[in-house]
Amino acid sequence: MSRKLVIDPVTRIEGHGKVVVHLDDDNKVVDAKLHVVEFRGFEKFVQGHPFWEAPMFLQRICGICFVSHHLCGAKALDDMVGVGLKSGIHVTPTAEKMRRLGHYAQMLQSHTTAYFYLIVPEMLFGMDAPPAQRNVLGLIEANPDLVKRVVMLRKWGQEVIKAVFGKKMHGINSVPGGVNNNLSIAERDRFLNGEEGLLSVDQVIDYAQDGLRLFYDFHQKHRAQVDSFADVPALSMCLVGDDDNVDYYHGRLRIIDDDKHIVREFDYHDYLDHFSEAVEEWSYMKFPYLKELGREQGSVRVGPLGRMNVTKSLPTPLAQEALERFHAYTKGRTNNMTLHTNWARAIEILHAAEVVKELLHDPDLQKDQLVLTPPPNAWTGEGVGVVEAPRGTLLHHYRADERGNITFANLVVATTQNNQVMNRTVRSVAEDYLGGHGEITEGMMNAIEVGIRAYDPCLSCATHALGQMPLVVSVFDAAGRLIDERAR
């Protein structure tokens, strides 16, 4: 008699999803899937709106990575009005650096939330710890000083975002061709020196290093478990800049294989020539893949692990030192170990802090050349924007009619890019923890969630559960009859 186990909902991720695992008569895993059960429809909602509303409208997809959607939309609008990089015209240095400042501040803030609030509980307490302990409240009780540092670190990132975009959430600064405001000297000094109850930028870097050391300690104690947990091969993809390394704001899309050979590299405006999307009836989320390789061989991994696989170096000294250690661990090959995503995420927190410090010292942020006026007859009616969001490569593609109203929108978000590899991760973990015995335990079910949480999936808006998980496990026979159900 086959069995069907349901983990519904998956907790401590952004949004709502469930996991379904199918077992055969011998309790071997037949299949395992991540079901995304929410339908948002923002691509349809934005149609008919004026094109200039897109960055403000579509950033409301998420309360966590809204800066990425805002900037991705702004870059697409740069294209539409004829001042985008596709036309060979660049926004002013002040505009680009202001956008980059806010982007890296969000990288720091978002990764801090994911790493410390959602992932560290498993690192400190273990997968088998009681649900009431395995969350941020448990962290407060076990290590209040750590939580205080994390709160201050996240606050600092939020304040930089506010200074750049005008609001802590759903900003208003980026416009077609540039930005509305620069950064004042008073604001700059506030972040550099730690005024008004904020950390200084050097303290931020110190705290980021503490986070990296936390992973090193965890890895040293649990090396075998961490390394063997869902080692799932996949292609890796991210934006690379003119220096041939990861660029979080602009570049070419590069895809590499397990030997770090370049499989494809292309201008992101041509993404439709290279990628297709599969659809499954059991999920509202699509499955992108490289056309020439097909769905099974052409799926990609994006996000911290994908970026650290693709890039050869990082332009900041402390993060570069950490990256060298990361690369040395796999002896030059691609790192496919799912839980090493958290290692990569910790490196990116440090890198973002260092980049923000460099940008704060850049005098271009105080200049007043903010918006580039489009040349005559420059309107193209179509634009594509791509950035590296915290969770991975994010793409916005818009078309508008002669009145400037949007007629088409396609959003390829990082979690969608990771959809296939997340499902493979679920299958791998299910085989290790469920196959052959079928015993349902708290630690076993949470192990599947741990695998998903490593990708920090943003399924819709920010939804985090505290305390005991509202988890339901249902067992069905081959005829689809419910024969057992457990809830807590």
From Swiss-Prot:
Reaction(s) the record says it catalyses: H2 + NAD(+) = NADH + H(+)
SUPFAM superfamilies in alphabetical order: HydB/Nqo4-like (SSF56762)
EC number: 1.12.1.2
Principal subcellular localisation of the protein: cytoplasm
Names of the cofactor(s): FMN; Ni(2+)
Binding site for Ni(2+): C62, C65, C458, C461
InterPro entries in UniProt: Ni-dep_hyd_lsu, Ni-dep_hyd_lsu_Ni_BS, NiFe-Hase_large
GO terms under cellular component: cytoplasm
Pfam name, any one: NiFeSe_Hases
An example Gene Ontology molecular-function term: hydrogen dehydrogenase activity
Keyword tags: Cytoplasm, Metal-binding, NAD, Nickel, Oxidoreductase, Plasmid
Compartments, record wording: Cytoplasm
Family: Belongs to the [NiFe]/[NiFeSe] hydrogenase large subunit family.
Record note on quaternary structure: Tetramer of an alpha and a gamma subunits (flavin-containing dimer), and a delta and a nickel-containing beta subunits (hydrogenase dimer).
Protein name, per record: NAD-reducing hydrogenase HoxS subunit beta
